[in-house]
C-alpha cells in the first residue's frame, strides 16, 4: 500500500511540474511577444516568421537531445507527420489572421469555444462521454473567462471565417497529439522533435509571405537592434519550453482537461497585462477571474468524482477475475507508457 502511494507521488509532482512549466512559459512568451511586436515596443510585426524561429530552435534542441541519447527516436510515418504539421501550421496562421481581423474580445471568444469543440471532437472521434458535473464546470469556466475578457465584439465575415478555421484546426491539433502518442507509443518530446523541423522549414519558407499579407512589410525591411534581437531570443527560448510543456500536458491529461486548465493562463495574462502594460482592469474583469478560478476548482472536483465512481464499479459474474487481471495488465502497460512520456524522468 505504501509502495503504491510512493509511486503516485513522483507522478503527481511531475504532473504539477509539467503544468507549471506550461503556464509560466505560455504567459511569459505572450508578455515577451507583446513587447516585441507592439508599436510601443520593438515593432517586430512578423508573427508567422517569428513562429518559424521558435520551431527552428525547438528542432535544434530535439536534434541535440537525440544525438546525446537523452531521448530515443521512434518511427512515425512521414505522411502522419506531414498531416499533423499542416494542421498545426494552419492553426497558427489562422490564429494570426483572426487576431488581426477581429477585436481582441472576439479573438478570445473564439479561443474559449475550443473547449466545447474539443469535447464534441473527442465524443465523435473517441466516443468519450462526460459527466454532468464536468459539463457544468466547463460552462462555469467558459462564462467566467468570457466575462473576464470580452469587452467589445465586432464581427466581420473574413474574421469570422478565420476564427472558425483557427478553432477547428487547433482543437484537431491538440487531439492529434494525444492520439499519435498512444498510437505509436512515442514520448511527447520525441513527437515534438519529429514535427518541429517540418513546421520550422514550412513556416520559414511561407511565413514571410503570410506576414507581408498581414502587415504589408517584408522582414528584410526591419531594422534589427541589439535589444530586439535579445527579445527575439528570449521569445524563442520560452517557445521551446512552451512547446515541450504543451506536449507533456496533453500527453498526461486529456485534450479537454488541457483546454479547461489552460484558461488559467488567460487570467494570468490579463493580470500581468494590467500590472505591466497598464491594461484596463474593471470590476467585470475581476469578477470573471474569480468565476473562472471557481470553475477550475469545480472541474478538479468533478474529475475526481468521476474517477471514484468508475473505481467503485466492480464487475460481477464468473468472468470477473479475468476482467480484473486484464484491467491490471492494461494499467501496467499504460503506466510504462506514461513513464516513457515523462521527459524529466529520462535523465533525472
UniProtKB/Swiss-Prot annotation:
Keyword Membrane (UniProt): yes
Keyword terms, alphabetized: Antiport, Golgi apparatus, Membrane, Sugar transport, Transmembrane, Transmembrane helix, Transport
InterPro entries: Sugar_P_trans_dom, TPT_transporter
Pfam families recorded: TPT
Membrane-related topology note: Multi-pass membrane protein
Coiled coil location: none
GO cellular component: Golgi apparatus; Golgi membrane
Phenotypic consequence of gene deletion: No visible phenotype. Lower content of seed mucilage.
Subcellular localization(s) per the UniProt record: Golgi apparatus membrane
Chain ranges passing through the membrane: 12-32, 44-64, 81-101, 104-124, 133-153, 160-180, 196-216, 230-250, 257-277, 286-306
Any one GO BP annotation for this protein: mucilage biosynthetic process involved in seed coat development
Gene Ontology molecular function: any one: antiporter activity
Function: Nucleotide-sugar transporter that transports UDP-rhamnose or UDP-galactose and UMP in a strict counter-exchange mode.
Family of this protein: Belongs to the TPT transporter family. TPT (TC 2.A.7.9) subfamily.
Protein name as it appears in the record: UDP-rhamnose/UDP-galactose transporter 2
